[in-house]
Swiss-Prot record:
Keywords: Hydrolase, Periplasm, Protease, Repeat, Serine protease, Signal, Stress response. This is Probable periplasmic serine endoprotease DegP-like. Residues 290-381, 394-485 form the PDZ domain. CDD domains: cpPDZ1_DegP-like. Residues 128-289 are annotated as: Serine protease. PANTHER family: SERINE PROTEASE FAMILY S1C HTRA-RELATED, SERINE PROTEASE HTRA2, MITOCHONDRIAL. Coiled coil: none annotated. Its EC number is 3.4.21.107. The active site is at H143 (charge relay system), D173 (charge relay system), S247 (charge relay system). It is found in: Periplasm. Might be efficient in the degradation of transiently denatured and unfolded proteins which accumulate in the periplasm following stress conditions. It is an enzyme of class 3 (hydrolase). GO terms for biological process: proteolysis.
Length: 497
């Protein structure tokens, strides 16, 4: 009975696809009436359909697996990571397990005022990648090859190569590396915008070092954001089994095309519970193409600080529904200021496309090339206004790079982070995401979870402002005013230059 029920369910959903060779019941040419098959014929047909879908998955696995590689990243000699301390601030256990990546674990495992991170030697980082050209370009996650000393790549046939880094983009957690080889099997990208909830999804990777593991699931959701994994989020959610070691591997459609790059999971134990996230192929390809051609990513810049719209704000600003993004600040001299955008404008559409979320708008602007003209539809004092803006290149992050050299990673403080930290939503400062053990920052006592309030005696409330201050401090020590809870202190980061 269970077998028959399974067959019926499958035959009324998946197997109506012409790709799988399903044919509807035949009609009598003289009467036009559908002729029902006997029960034995129906059962035989259903078994054939099950075999057909099995062959479909097998075909994808056979064709795609040779293009998937096993990556081992051996960090630089002496490189250390900060062990994640216990959760002491009343937070719920962080559900996002970033494939044993200390950077992400530290993001939520914040130390208490009295705790200092305990340095420990880093082990090799192991993950997955996939080949995108016959001459050896390989895509993976940034966190798989971060702080790389030596990168080993093992092909499906067992051949091993040493890889070099071509380009890194931590803002999307993507990276491109290259091996010296020719005539390699490679994967092609599909269109992630065409995905529908319930479509098949196939993940290939190396979970726990078990190479060439294939798992199958469906697309559970699209457009997942505000997960605080990376700066630019538009994740595909899938229930295809993804575990530590799958990071950087491909998520495929039933045609064997890459529709996403597997990046993170939700887990209370570190293992699979049915919720995984992949970077959509359209976003990934834009980044990957630039990394291959230029070694870096150029992003569009509007020059506004945004806040998500909730039901209360929607009512306050007289929106007909909950959508759009609220401008809380306009950067001086930015394209937004020059175009006439104001604080408290609500951006509800760009180039005629409705703004579903703050993240969707940020992603769209960032993917625009400098010089692109975009028409923004805003709500101002209850009225709709269209404002054309020409985006420019996002300002060089010299300041952030200088800070990273001193061992600190930062990001803008968002309302969501404020909520997790128990801070007021209008708190100003820059959030310390991670600190490299043994770095000048670690020696000075900077720890993840602190807020940077001022740099060289100048108040800062955004990464853009931090950049401006640090651009004028090249080669000099940096004085930071940092806070953690109610404790404020000053620390000096010593420059190596």
């Amino acid at each position: 009975m269970m077998k028959r029920l399974l067959c019926v369910l499958l035959s009324t959903s998946v197997f109506s696809s012409p790709m799988l060779g399903y044919s509807a019941p035949k009609k009598d040419s003289s009467t036009g009436i559908c002729l029902a098959a006997s029960q034995s014929d129906r059962e035989l047909s259903q078994e054939d359909l099950l075999k057909e879908v099995s062959r479909g998955f097998s075909k994808v696995a056979a064709q795609a697996t040779p293009g998937v590689v096993y990556i081992e990243n051996f960090p630089k000699t002496g490189s250390q990571a900060i062990a994640s301390p216990g959760n002491k601030r009343g937070f719920q256990e962080n559900p996002f397990d970033y494939f044993n990546d200390e950077f992400f674990n530290r993001f939520f495992g914040l130390p208490s005022h009295r705790e200092q991170p305990r340095p420990q030697q880093r082990d090799a980082v192991r993950g997955t990648g996939f080949i995108v050209s016959e001459d050896g370009y390989v895509v993976t996650n940034h966190h798989v090859v971060e702080d790389a000393g030596k990168i080993h790549v093992t092909l499906h046939d067992g051949q091993k190569y040493t890889a070099k880094i071509i380009g890194l983009d931590p803002k999307t957690d993507l990276a491109v590396i290259k091996i010296q080889a020719k005539n390699l099997p490679f994967l092609t990208f599909g269109n992630s915008d065409q995905l529908q909830i319930g479509d098949w999804s196939i993940a290939i990777g190396n979970p726990f070092g078990l190479q060439a593991t294939v798992t199958v699931g469906v697309i559970s959701a699209k457009g997942r954001n505000q997960l605080h994994i990376v700066d630019f989020e538009d994740f595909i959610q899938t229930d295809a089994a993804i575990n530590p070691g799958n990071s950087g591997g491909p998520l495929l459609n039933i045609d064997g095309q890459v529709i996403g790059v597997n990046t993170a999971i939700v887990s209370g134990s570190g293992g699979y519970i049915g919720i995984g996230f992949a970077i959509p192929s359209l976003m990934a390809k834009r980044v990957i193409d630039q990394l291959i051609s230029d070694g870096q990513v150029t992003r569009g810049f509007l020059g506004v600080t945004l806040q998500p719209i909730d039901s209360e704000l929607a009512a306050c600003y007289k929106l007909e529904k909950v959508y759009g993004a609220l401008i809380t600040d306009v950067v001086k001299g930015s394209p937004a200021e020059k175009a006439g955008l104001r604080q408290e404008d609500v951006i509800v559409a760009y180039n005629g496309k409705e703004v579903e979320s703050l993240s969707a708008l940020r992603n769209a602007i960032s993917l625009m090339m400098p010089g692109t003209r975009v028409v923004l539809k805003v709500v101002r004092e209850g009225k709709f206004i269209e404002i054309p803006v020409t985006v420019t290149q996002i300002p060089a992050e010299d300041g952030v790079s200088a800070l990273q050299k001193m061992g600190v990673r930062v990001q803008n403080l968002t309302p969501e982070i404020c909520k997790k930290l128990g801070l007021a939503s209008d708190t100003r400062g820059i959030f310390v995401v991670s600190v490299e053990a043994g770095s000048p920052a670690a020696s000075a006592g900077v720890v993840p979870g602190q807020l940077i309030l001022a740099v060289n005696r100048q108040r800062v409330s955004s990464v853009e402002e931090l950049n401006q201050v640090l651009k004028n401090a090249k080669g000099e020590n940096v004085l930071l005013m940092v806070s953690q809870g109610e404790v404020i202190r000053f620390v000096v980061l010593k420059s190596d230059e």
